[in-house]
Amino acid sequence: MLTRKIKLWDINAHITCRLCNGYLIDATTVTECLHTFCRSCLVKYLEENNTCPTCRIVIHQSHPLQYIGHDRTMQDIVYKLVPGLQEAEMRKQREFYHKLGMEVPGDIKAEILTVKQHVEAHRNGETKTDEHTHKEPPEEKQEEDHDYHRSDEQVSICLECNSSKLRGLKRKWIRCSAQATVLHLKKFIAKKLNLSSFNELDILCNEEILGKDHTLKFVVVTRWRFKKAPLLLHYRPKMDLL
């Protein structure tokens, strides 16, 4: 089989963010046109605009953040193509928490450890996947299975109903992983209220509809940065946006 080498420079245009001109971090794609950007760059841009930065198509007149989604496949591709990028990003996150005097969340610790193991394996020439290399001891596997993200950074939430068409939750105060998404909350509320579909719900923060792929950590940082816990979210029946 014939193979040829391709320079990273030749594909840079496909794996960089048009807004910051850096390699994609937390890749996020516009569902309407499929153009991809760094999540932080795109969200900041959409706070004052409602069009795609690349093709200028209108994403949505009033709620463009509802029509973007995390692109895990693209992010995996970028990390595999750019040597050291994922390791550098994990190091930045670790330094960020240390600078604030905060403990690094368990999920980030796990990702940092995975990256280190991957880098060390390549340095040692272990390019082939070994069945025994990535197997975890039974005790560690069992402990991980029963952790349920309790070692993650946690977020305290108050879920309030702001519609007469839905009833309030009996227990509106919850605490969960910062990596949980708005979609997880929708499913939780739908289950508690016996709704036929979680898609019938909108969840809002500061009267702004949140995208289903937004993590709670992202919501806290961008919508609740200077406010005290708990994070106050409201839910209501889904409204069709024109």
UniProtKB/Swiss-Prot annotation:
It comes from the Eukaryota. Its main location: nucleus. Residues 120-149 are annotated as: Disordered. A zinc finger (RING-type) spans 17-56. SUPFAM superfamilies: RING/U-box (SSF57850). GO terms for molecular function: zinc ion binding. Keywords: Metal-binding, Nucleus, Repressor, Transcription, Transcription regulation, Zinc, Zinc-finger. One of its GO terms (cellular component) is PcG protein complex. Transmembrane segments: none annotated. Pfam families: RAWUL, zf-C3HC4_2. It is found in: Nucleus. Coiled coil: none annotated. Component of a PRC1-like complex. Component of a Polycomb group (PcG) multiprotein PRC1-like complex, a complex class required to maintain the transcriptionally repressive state of many genes, including Hox genes, throughout development. PcG PRC1 complex acts via chromatin remodeling and modification of histones; it mediates monoubiquitination of histone H2A 'Lys-119', rendering chromatin heritably changed in its expressibility. Within the PRC1-like complex, regulates RNF2 ubiquitin ligase activity. PANTHER family: POLYCOMB GROUP RING FINGER PROTEIN. This is Polycomb group RING finger protein 3. It comes from Xenopus tropicalis (Western clawed frog).
